[in-house]
Amino acid sequence: MSGAQRGQRGGERRGGRDDRRGQGADKTAYIERVVAINRVAKVVKGGRRFSFTALVVVGDGEGLVGVGYGKAKEVPAAIAKGVEEAKKHFFRVPRIQGTIPHPVQGEKAAGVVLLRPAAPGTGVIAGGPVRAVLECAGIHDVLSKSLGSSNQINIVHATVEALRMLEQPEAVAARRGLPVEEVAPAALLKARVEVPAGVSEEVSS
């Protein structure tokens, strides 16, 4: 067998492995949103060393979402680190017919985010950082308002804190000693989206 033929067969084998890796990647595809990219400098003896930071939101669009922060010398590497960090902090978000079960408020540092349920067809009424988190989580109808700090990192984490505080209507009703119908509209309860037990617990990627 000639060297060219061996090289050709070797290339075919390598291509086969690449194809298998591609098929595996499709099974774990997620929605990724880059919220912010910043260049930072570190002063050292020889001068300044520049690097990039990336704030990334990752979700499956079906109630699973996480936020990550990556830092590297190049933008793509910073984003990749942010994606991996976000996957380590996945958590489940309770949803009912594409919206949230009840109003909620999240705070992080000086950032405050208010979220309220909305009727089907309303859409995501939110600014960029809040919208990124909600869309990755699979929330399609919601009203939001950001107060206090305009820092994107604080706003994103305030949104995450708000989502972590969400509960299923049954849990809220049991705690308050009320019928479920008084906690959430009957129309939403009828068309609710089932969420696995332990919605507030983090899950591995």
From Swiss-Prot:
Q: Which Pfam families match?
A: Ribosomal_S5, Ribosomal_S5_C
The Basic and acidic residues compositionally biased stretches are 9-24
Q: From the UniProt entry, list the residue stretches annotated as the region Disordered.
A: 1-25
The record's Gene Ontology cellular component field reads: small ribosomal subunit
A single GO BP term for this record reads: translation
Molecular function as annotated in GO: rRNA binding; structural constituent of ribosome
Q: Where in the numbering of this chain does the S5 DRBM domain appear?
A: 30-93
- Top-rank taxon of the source lineage equals Bacteria
Q: Which Gene3D superfamilies match?
A: 3.30.160.20, 3.30.230.10
Could you tell me the keywords of this UniProt record?
Ribonucleoprotein, Ribosomal protein, RNA-binding, rRNA-binding
Q: Which InterPro entries match?
A: Ribosomal_Su5_D2-typ_SF, Ribosomal_uS5, Ribosomal_uS5_bac-type, Ribosomal_uS5_C, Ribosomal_uS5_N, Ribosomal_uS5_N_CS, Ribsml_uS5_D2-typ_fold_subgr
Assembly with partners or alone: Part of the 30S ribosomal subunit. Contacts proteins S4 and S8.
Q: Which family does it belong to?
A: Belongs to the universal ribosomal protein uS5 family.
Entry note about domains: The N-terminal domain interacts with the head of the 30S subunit; the C-terminal domain interacts with the body and contacts protein S4. The interaction surface between S4 and S5 is involved in control of translational fidelity.
Instruction: List, alphabetically, the PANTHER family matched.
Output: MITOCHONDRIAL RIBOSOMAL PROTEIN S5
Task performed by this protein: With S4 and S12 plays an important role in translational accuracy. Located at the back of the 30S subunit body where it stabilizes the conformation of the head with respect to the body.
Quote the protein name from its UniProt record.
Small ribosomal subunit protein uS5
Which organism's genome codes for this protein? Answer: Nocardioides sp. (strain ATCC BAA-499 / JS614)
The gene that this protein is the product of is: rpsE
